[in-house]
Every structure is written in structure tokens, then in C-alpha cells.
Amino acid sequence: NLIAKFSGIKEVFQYPLFQKKQQHITETPKKFIKEKFELTVKDDPEIEIDDIIAKKTIEKFQIDKKEINILLGIGGSGPTKRIPANTFIKVIDKISKIKNCKFFLATGKNEEEQVILRDILSSEFSGLCKPLDDFSLREIMPLIKNCNLSICNDTSFSHLSAALGVKTITLMADTPLIY
């Protein structure tokens, strides 16, 4: 707060210090926003994508609506949050045996994430997979909206797909139990 005063900032809004332990991940910020700004936040907000953009994305990524289109969020913010490539390969194997599918592989440019991506793309299922690491979030979000399912590590892609209204399975590795 001292820096804020020197900077001429009149009001500072923050969570109480040293009280994060045992805070509920969504109820605490909702309460904070309600008290400080008199705004009510919905429990289940959804990100909307313009229909024209969604249709252009279908063409751009050659999405076939006769197939089951699945986002696989294979990246992660840290090595302990990332599920090994072999697990995703097993998922692709099992699902592709019973359904006609296409898998979109969402990850960042981090070298460890790229290893997972390369392992999947060098598997026998590479023809079913489309890497998304060269695309921006602006390009990827309409693609996610066109997916039937999302299976992701506990990453931004799991949160985005859920917020876009896509059925989402989040794979939890090293995540605190409070979440």
C-alpha cells in the first residue's frame, strides 16, 4: 500500500494478507467483488464466440461435424502438472477404436511441452491429430467452441473449454486439494 500512496493511487483492492489458507477458490473472489463493487458474478459464466467466426474456424481447421472433435490440452504450467504423452496416446487409442475422431493438441512452446507434442505426433495416431502450438488463443478459442469434448491437464485450456460451454474433463496431477 505504501507504493500505491506514493503513486497517487487512492484506493487499493486486495484480498486480506495471510488469509488465503482454506479460502474457497470461487466463493472468495465472488464475495470480494460483491462487497467492493456491488456486482454479482454468475456461478457459471460462459464465453461467447461469434457464429461467423465459429463457421470460418470450421473451414480453416477442416473440422468435420460427422467426427467427434476433441481438444487435448497436453501442456501445463509446470512439469508436475503435465500428464505424460503415453497417457494421452492411450486415450486417443481407446476413443478412436469406438468413435471416428479428430484430436486437437493444445500446448505452449515450452520445450518440455513440445516433447509431449512430438511424442504424440510420432505415434501411430499422428494422422488423427492436429497441433495447435503455432496458433494464437484468438484463433484457438473458436476451434475449442467447435469441439465436442475437451480432455486437458489442469491448464488454461481446461478453464477456457469449460467457459466456452464444451464438456471438459480436467486431469489433475500436482494440484492443491483446496482447488
Predicted regions and their residues:
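Catalytic machinery of carbohydrate-active enzymes
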Residues: 1-179
